[in-house]
Amino acid sequence: MSKTSADIIIIGGGAAGLMAAAGAARTLSAKKPEAKVIVLEKMPRPGRKIMITGKGRCNFTNLKNWNEFSEHVHPKPGFLKPSFYNLTSEKMIDYLTDAGMESVVERGDRAFPASHLASDVVDALVGSAEYAGAEVLCGKEVNKISHAEDAEERYTVACNDGSIYTSRKLIICTGGLSYPKTGSTGDGYRWAKEMGHSIKALFPSLTAIVPSGYKDVTPLSKEKSVVKGHIDRSTPLAETGSMLCGNQLKNVGLSIVIDGNIADEEFGDLDFTDGGLEGPIGFKMSRKCVNALINGSKVVAVIDMKPAVEIEDLQVRIATLWNEIAKDKRSANKLYKDRFRILLTKVLPMQLIPAFVKLNPNADHKTLAKTLKAWKMEIEGFVGYERCVVTAGGVNIEEITPKTLESRLIPGLYFAGEVIDLDGDTGGYNLQIAFSTGYLAGMSAARQLIY
C-alpha cells in the first residue's frame, strides 16, 4: 500500500480540475517551488467530457462581457463574479494561446479551437498544468476521503488501487452526473455530504425535452430513473417522433408555458432529434422544463414558425396565397386537402409538412396563420443524465465562500466546476464556469499555504 504526501490534492481531471492544478502550481512556484500539487483522475485520460463538448469541436468559452455573460448563469450568477473577473473569457483565450492553441470566435461570441478539435483544448490544459509543476495521475478512482482538523495533513484520500494520498488542502472538481461514461458519476456530491455540506436538488439541464407521443414509451417511475419524467433516449421513436426527427427549424420563436403561464420565450434555431426538441433554444429552455416536470407541473412548448410576421399580416398573406391557388387551373379542381397541402408548401419546409398535418388535424386555410404562430406541443418528459450536457443543482453555494471557493464549514476544502450549484446555458458558458472557478480555487488554496 503506497502513501504519498502532497500540499494540494485535486480530485477530478476535467476542466475545473486541470485549471485548479495550474492555478495552484503557478501560485506556489514563486514562493514555495517545492510544494506538491497532485490531480487524481479516475479515467485512463484526463478531460474525457471536454472531448465530446460541441460534438467534438469544443465551444470552450463565450466572449460576452460580465453583464451579458451573467444572464446565462443559474441560479445565482453573482456567486461566479469573483471567479469570472479573476479569469475572464478573454484571459482564458490568452491562457490557451500561451499553451500553443489558437482560437476562433463564431456567431454568438462562441470561441472554439482553430482546429475545431476538442483534443487540442485538453492537450493545452494538461500541458499547462504539468508545465506549471502539477502532477496529473490517471486511473486513480477515489473511494474514500477523510479529514482530521488537528493534523497538518488533514486530508487523506484512498484510491481503489490501494494507494493513499494525504494533503493540507483538498479541491473537489468531480463534475456532475451528466455523461457518466466520461467519469461523471456524482462522487463529489456524496463526499461533500459526508463532510457536512448540503446538496441542492440535482436534475438534468441542456437536454432534449420530449413532446407527448414523441417516444414509444411512458415516463419511467422514480424507482427506475434518477428523476421523474426521464425518458430513455434509446427507446424507439413513436410515429410523431419519426415524422419530426431530422427537421431543423431556423429563426423560430419558442415559448414555454408552465401551468398556463408563459415562463420563458426565445428566438433562434430548434432541432427535432431522436431525443426530442434540442438545438440552441430547445436546450436553453430545458432547464425550466425539466424542473417544472419534476415538480408535477404541466408544460407546453409553443413554436412560432413566423416570428418576424404579425399574425394579421400573416393572415393576409395566406389568404392571398389561397386565392392564387384557387385561381390556378392546375389546382382548381383538386380536393380541398390537396389544395391545402399546396398552401403548406409555400409557408413550411417540405419535410415538415407530414408531421404538421398529423399534429394539427383541424388546421385549414382560415386557421393556418394562428396555428403557425402558436404550434403547441405538450411536453411529457426529458432525456436524462446519459445525454444531458450539464447537471443543475449541486453543493450549496451558500456554504462556499465566493471569493476563494473554500468551504465555509471545513477549512482547507474547496469546490469548483459542475459539482457546485452553478450551471450555464449552451454557448460556452459551462466550460468557462469550470475554468474560472477551478483556477480561483487552485490559487486560493495555494495562497493559504504561502501566507
Named regions from a protein language model:
Residues S2-A16:
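Beta1/beta-strand and adjacent pyrophosphate-binding region of the FAD-binding site
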Residues K42-H74:
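Conserved N-terminal glycine-rich FAD pyrophosphate-binding loop of Rossmann-like flavoproteins
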Residues R45, W66-E68, K76, Y85, ...:
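Residue-level recognition of phosphate/Mg2+-coordinating polar/acidic sites
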Residues A129-V142, L202:
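A conserved beta-strand/loop element that lines the FAD pocket in flavoprotein oxidoreductases
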